[in-house]
C-alpha cells in the first residue's frame, strides 16, 4: 500500500487563542462631559509551522464636550489605531502553500526523507520562510463648536483631519530541500542508490 499524508493536519493548528482587553471611562463635571476608550487585541494565526503568524491591534479614543456659556459649546475628539499582521513570507502569491495544501494529492510526501533531510512541501516552506508584516496606522482628530444665535437658530462648525498609513515588509525565502516533483531514487541500508532496469531487476 501507499502512505497517505494529511497536509491540513501538518499545516493548520487545531486552535488559535485570541486575547482582547477594553477599557472605557466616561463622566461629567459641571457642563463638561468626556469619554476615554482603550483597546488591545491579540490573535494567533492558524499556521502550525510558521515562525510568526499573529495579528495585534492597539486602539484609543477620547472625546470632550463643554458648554462654555449659553451661546457657545465646544467639542473635540480623536481616534488612533495601530494594526500589525505578521505572517510567513512565502514570496509567491500565485502558488503559495495554502494552495498546494489542497491541490496536492495525499500521496505527495511531507516531512523529511529517511535520512532526515527536509522535503520541499507546503509545511516546510512556511517553517523555512522569514517573517513578513503588514502594519496599518490610522489617526483622526475632530474639532467643532455650536453657536446658539437665537432660541431657534444655531450655527455648527466641525473640522476633521485624518491620516492613514500602510507599511509592508517582505523578504525572499531561501532554503534547501529535496524535490518531490520527480520520481525518487530508493536507498539501501548502506547508503547506495538502488537502480532498476526496464525488467525491474536491480
Model feature map: region roles:
Residues 1-51:
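Residues embedded in well-ordered regular secondary structure
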Residues 24-28, 63-65, 144-146, 158:
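Transmembrane beta-barrel domains of outer membrane proteins
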Residues 18, 29-30, 65-71, 148-150:
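Outer-membrane beta-barrel channels and translocator barrels
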Residues 19-23, 58-62, 139-143:
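Hydrophobic, lipid-facing positions within transmembrane beta-strands of outer-membrane proteins
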Amino acid at each position: 500500500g501507499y502512505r497517505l499524508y494529511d497536509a491540513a493536519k501538518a499545516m493548520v493548528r487545531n486552535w488559535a487563542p485570541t486575547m482582547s482587553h477594553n477599557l472605557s471611562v466616561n463622566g461629567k463635571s459641571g457642563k463638561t462631559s468626556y469619554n476615554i476608550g482603550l483597546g488591545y487585541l491579540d490573535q494567533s494565526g492558524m499556521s502550525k509551522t510558521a515562525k510568526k503568524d499573529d495579528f495585534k491591534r492597539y486602539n484609543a479614543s477620547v472625546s470632550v464636550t463643554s458648554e462654555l456659556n449659553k451661546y457657545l459649546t465646544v467639542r473635540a475628539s480623536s481616534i488612533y489605531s495601530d494594526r500589525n499582521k505578521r505572517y510567513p513570507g512565502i514570496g509567491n502569491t500565485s502558488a503559495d502553500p495554502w494552495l498546494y495544501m489542497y491541490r496536492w494529492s495525499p500521496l505527495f510526501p511531507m516531512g523529511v526523507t529517511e535520512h532526515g533531510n527536509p522535503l520541499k512541501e507546503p509545511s516546510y516552506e512556511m517553517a523555512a520562510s522569514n517573517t513578513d508584516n503588514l502594519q496599518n496606522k490610522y489617526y483622526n482628530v475632530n474639532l467643532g463648536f455650536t453657536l446658539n444665535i437665537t432660541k431657534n437658530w444655531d450655527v455648527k462648525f466641525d473640522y476633521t483631519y485624518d491620516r492613514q498609513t500602510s507599511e509592508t515588509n517582505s523578504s525572499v525565502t531561501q532554503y534547501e530541500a529535496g524535490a518531490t516533483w520527480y520520481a525518487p531514487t530508493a536507498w539501501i541500508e548502506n547508503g547506495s542508490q538502488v537502480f532498476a532496469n526496464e525488467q525491474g531487476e536491480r
